[in-house]
Design a protein with these regions (language model features):
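Membrane-embedded transmembrane alpha-helical bundles that form the catalytic cores
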Residues: 1-253
């Protein structure tokens, strides 16, 4: 699937750049959108939707016969799907010139440090760095090692430790009192942050060792004073991508 998405969007990028007519450009862009979102919908959300709507239909006397698919969720499908779509959208908007080398685009799509857990990098930021093939500076190596160590600490020492306590309490919640359950919920929120933030720190640190700069993914979200600020500081790459490519396109500001 990664190879299919890479081939489709590399080809679409070349066609978009060469197209002069607006109608044809839209057709190529739609090909990219439907291909990527279609693959994502089938492999990540097919089971969820059919298992959710089948019982709902039976309540109203309906009967939905759906195909049972033993789908194995591909690693990182959400991240590279949005990443390749940013490439074709930016070319369509005139913000990016497509890369001429397929290998450069393939590395951009499958860049291993951030493929599994992000951050979701835009083509305008990551692709030019890959094309230049930079050598890491001494500062990048030092900062990269610090990020990797910090990420491992957050993931193993905080996230995993909190997870063991949370799993133990959630396994038999009826034997615990309200304060203990409340503490477990708070620990669960810490576990989620430590896991995601830890993975991201490791990804950013590994990229620095390769001379590549990735964007921040989290900015101390639990110190936010309101929901809006929390949204801006949690999963930054996804929230900013949705704002720029969806919200503003629909008329937001």
């Amino acid at each position: 699937l990664l190879v299919i998405s890479t081939i489709i969007d590399f080809t679409v990028g070349q066609k978009l750049y060469k197209c002069q007519e607006s109608k044809n450009k839209k057709r190529w862009l739609l090909l990219s959108m439907f291909s990527n979102l279609g693959i994502l919908a089938v492999f990540k959300y097919y089971g969820f939707f059919v298992e959710s709507f089948a019982p709902l239909a039976s309540i109203f006397g309906g009967n939905i016969d759906y195909l049972h698919l033993n789908i194995i969720l591909p690693v990182g499908i959400s991240f590279y799907t949005f990443q390749t779509m940013s490439y074709t959208i930016d070319i369509y908007r005139g913000r990016l010139t497509p890369t001429k080398k397929f290998i450069d685009f393939a590395v951009f799509v499958s860049f291993f440090p951030q493929l599994v857990a992000g951050p979701i990098e835009r083509a305008t930021n990551l692709l030019p760095q890959i094309v230049k093939r930079p050598m890491p500076s001494k500062s990048q190596i030092e900062k990269g090692l610090v990020l990797i160590i910090t990420g491992l600490f957050k993931k193993v020492m905080i996230g995993d430790a909190a997870g063991r306590i949370v799993d133990h309490i959630f396994l038999q919640p009826d034997i615990y009192k309200s304060p203990e359950l409340l503490a477990a919920l708070m620990l669960f929120s810490i576990q989620i942050y430590a896991d995601f933030s830890g993975y991201t720190s490791i990804a950013r640190g590994t990229a620095k060792l390769l001379g590549i700069e990735l964007m921040k993914h989290f900015e101390q979200p639990y110190l936010s004073q309101n929901i809006t600020e929390f949204w801006r500081r949690w999963h930054i790459s996804l929230s900013s991508l949705l704002k720029d490519y969806l919200y503003i396109s629909l008329g937001g500001n």
